[in-house]
Swiss-Prot record:
Component of the multisubunit TRAPP (transport protein particle) complex, which includes at least TRAPPC2, TRAPPC2L, TRAPPC3, TRAPPC3L, TRAPPC4, TRAPPC5, TRAPPC8, TRAPPC9, TRAPPC10, TRAPPC11 and TRAPPC12. Interacts with the heterodimer TRAPPC3-TRAPPC6A. This is Trafficking protein particle complex subunit 2-like protein. GO terms for cellular component: cytoplasm; endoplasmic reticulum; Golgi apparatus; nucleus; perinuclear region of cytoplasm; TRAPP complex. It is found in: Cytoplasm, Perinuclear region; Endoplasmic reticulum; Golgi apparatus. May play a role in vesicular transport from endoplasmic reticulum to Golgi. GO terms for biological process: endoplasmic reticulum to Golgi vesicle-mediated transport. Belongs to the TRAPP small subunits family. Sedlin subfamily. Keywords: Cytoplasm, Endoplasmic reticulum, ER-Golgi transport, Golgi apparatus, Transport.
Length: 139
């Protein structure tokens, strides 16, 4: 489904980035980094409405020829960015939304770990396994 999944801290540094295939890793890192400007624009456009809103899904941030970039923001302003292959036309908006909810739940589990210091890179096997299950297996 996804070819790159990133968790970005409130201060815009990466807590976790995973991409496949690895030969395009730098390209995906660039796409995630550039999408943060769009995330900030969407958050500021929503203004106070975002505080009252329970749904933090930002939707499609921007499409490219080969990929689509989607975003999600938590209440603590941690950003989730997902890059999806554009050729996968069967993937619907509600499926992307449920993938972000699953990612958010797993991130919450990481945050509840007493040995995790908020702001550190995420190095959880359970989180990594969940992200791997969302990634496309490219042959």
């Amino acid at each position: 489904m996804a070819v790159c999944i990133a968790v970005i801290a409130k201060e815009n540094y990466p807590l976790y980035i995973r991409s496949t295939p690895t030969e395009n890793e730098l390209k995906f890192h660039y796409m995630v980094h550039t999408s943060l400007d769009v995330v900030d624009e969407k958050i500021s456009a929503m203004g106070k409405a975002l505080v009252d809103q329970r749904e933090l899904y930002l939707g499609l941030l921007y499409p490219t020829e080969d990929y689509k970039v989607y975003g999600y923001v938590t209440n603590s302003k941690v950003k989730f960015v997902m890059v999806v292959d554009s050729s996968n036309t069967a993937l619907r908006d509600n499926e992307i939304r449920s993938m972000f909810r699953k990612l958010h739940n797993s991130y919450t589990d990481v945050m509840c770990n007493p040995f995790y210091n908020p702001g550190d890179r995420i190095q959880s096997r359970a989180f990594d396994t969940m992200v791997t299950s969302m990634m496309v297996q490219v042959c």
